[in-house]
């Protein structure tokens, strides 16, 4: 153990697995993390001047409702998927959403938004939150679709998955990967 920081001059060679468990990314609220069968994992890497943030979500156990409403565990507050900061994610230039499994049960039209508050609840209108901004209007997601995120998240805002159409049901399938690319400013 070398303490909290180690510096190596020259080239570092590693044989075997490199575990970067300390590279945790955004932390989701309980409206995402308490869904039955829901998976949320995130990581951040910083190499040179490039930052890469990844958020992996299995939607199983979350719920969708009316158009423009927040997705999360039914009736649960804090249904955000985390926040980004310049210190943790760099200055974000852009991103992409990859659908790895077509959403089923709940609505497949899943948009990405951010707002000031972390407390947004499932089934609440995203427009009920302060300073909300739509980052991505995806249309119906299908396995294999990759969509650019034209509006990157503003620093220290909370991100939400939001229904683009109305299907009041629980998700039984659906896996998405959200990635952001940032730089040292």
Where are these regions (language model features)?
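Short structured motifs
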Residues: 38-39, 78-82, 96, 142-146
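C-terminal interaction-tip segments
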Residues: 44-48, 165-185
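A short beta-strand-loop element at or near the start of a globular domain
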Residues: 49-88
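Beta-rich globular "head" domains
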Residues: 77-114, 177-182
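Terminal beta-strand-rich extracellular "head" domains
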Residues: 104-148
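Noncatalytic modules at the cell exterior or secretory-pathway interfaces
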Residues: 149-170
């Amino acid at each position: 153990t070398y303490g909290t920081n180690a510096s190596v001059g020259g080239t570092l060679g590693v044989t075997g697995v490199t575990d970067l468990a300390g590279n945790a990314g955004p932390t989701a609220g309980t409206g995402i993390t308490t869904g039955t069968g829901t998976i949320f994992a995130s990581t951040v890497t910083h190499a040179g001047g490039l930052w890469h943030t990844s958020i992996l979500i299995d939607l199983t156990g979350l719920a969708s409702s009316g158009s423009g409403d927040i997705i999360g565990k039914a009736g649960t507050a804090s249904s955000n998927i985390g926040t980004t900061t310049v210190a943790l994610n760099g200055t974000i230039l852009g991103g992409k959403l990859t659908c790895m499994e077509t959403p089923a049960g709940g609505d497949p039209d899943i948009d990405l938004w951010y707002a000031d508050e972390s407390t947004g609840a499932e089934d609440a209108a995203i427009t009920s939150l302060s300073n909300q901004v739509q980052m991505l209007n995806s249309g119906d997601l299908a396995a294999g679709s990759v969509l650019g995120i034209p509006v990157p998240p503003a620093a220290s805002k909370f991100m939400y998955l939001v229904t683009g159409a109305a299907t009041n049901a629980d998700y039984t399938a659906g896996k998405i990967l959200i990635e952001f690319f940032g730089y040292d400013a």
